[in-house]
Regions:
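Bacterial N-terminal signal peptides that target proteins for export
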Residues: 2-14
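Bacterial N-terminal signal peptides
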Residues: 12-22
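PEST-like low-complexity, intrinsically disordered acidic/proline/serine-rich tracts
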Residues: 26-316
């Protein structure tokens, strides 16, 4: 009994000490949260704030800003408002729409950032660490695109010589309630369906902002090879809880039997002036360039020569 009494005495002796040691830990956390709230900076409550905007779920695209991209598509030779440099313009002018029928390209997924403007629904899924319960990554999934991981755990981007893919390598962080995504290591691919292209040196920054059931994505394409200035676009999605992504098996078929790769040599594309002649837009303006993005360019267009209008040829 004497040993039992001594053990009880030790427990009662150390219990107040343990309580005293544990109080500062809780009070420090509470004080940090309180200071962050009072300062309005969110310091001390970062984990709470980073989970306050949840992007997970099913979304459907509302192409209010990009109707041109999902209708018949922009015309050949129409680069108005695109900051193409000389190399980017030459690359775009070699485009032949017949390339979409090439077997090697039929099943290629839409690249970042074009996939935001693809038709159909999108799903955003959270990858959560099962032990720490911290957010490891968001995954975006589209009808005809690969699973895109957007890492949230602070991992660095790989070195320049790492493989480039259609979805690239994406990391993200929160700025307030906005999710800011940085993507590198992309393959060269299209940023518009009529020829304008981004190189494999491109860096894409995206801002995701949620307002209730609406999600706005702003993309900032910075390409030192093909663009004079960054190309900025936006698109809106709406949350739709009853939407489900359909199964999309891609089957390669012989759509265009040819022994040539569809393309035009520089200066040999005969369709570049068609848009200008049919729409009454100065041909010089249709060549694009950074200055065509700004409202002031309209005044310059007034002094440009416009070719006589030619009627659009009938398809029947």
């Amino acid at each position: 009994m004497g040993e039992v009494n001594r053990a009880k005495s030790i427990v009662f002796l150390f219990l107040p000490v343990m309580l005293l040691l544990s109080i500062p830990a809780f009070s420090q956390q509470g004080n940090a949260i309180e200071r962050g709230l009072q300062a309005g900076t969110g310091a001390g409550v970062e984990q709470v704030l980073t989970q306050s905007t949840d992007f997970a779920g099913e979304w459907v695209v509302r192409n209010w800003q990009n109707r041109l991209e999902r209708s018949a598509g922009p015309s050949l030779g129409d680069y108005l408002g695109m900051p193409l440099n000389a190399a980017g313009r030459m690359r775009a002018e070699t485009f032949d729409a017949g390339e979409w029928s090439v077997r090697d390209l039929q099943c290629r997924p839409h690249p970042v950032p074009y996939q935001w403007r693809a038709q159909g629904a999108m799903r955003i899924v959270k990858e959560v660490d099962p032990v720490s319960r911290e957010l490891v990554a968001y995954h975006t999934q589209y009808v005809r695109s690969l699973d895109r991981a957007i890492y949230m755990d602070g991992r660095p981007h790989p070195p320049d010589y790492a493989p480039h893919t259609w979805e690239g390598f994406s990391t993200a962080h929160f700025e307030g309630n906005d999710l800011v995504i940085t993507t590198t290591h992309l393959k060269e691919s299209y940023i518009r369906r009529n020829g304008p292209t981004m190189s494999d040196q491109v860096k894409v920054t995206e801002w995701l902002t949620r307002h209730g059931d609406y999600l706005t994505i702003v993309t900032y394409i910075d390409d030192p090879v093909y663009l004079e200035e960054p190309f900025i676009q936006s698109v809106t999605y709406q949350r739709e809880a009853h939407t489900e992504l359909e199964y999309f098996p891609c089957t390669i078929v012989n759509e265009n039997i040819s022994d040539k790769i569809p393309h035009f040599l520089p200066g040999k594309n005969p369709w570049l002036k068609e848009f200008s002649e049919q729409e009454g837009v100065p041909y010089e303006a249709t060549r694009g360039g950074a200055e065509t993005m700004y409202p002031e360019y309209r005044a310059k267009m007034k002094g440009m020569k416009v070719a006589p209008l030619k009627p659009t040829p009938s398809a029947f």
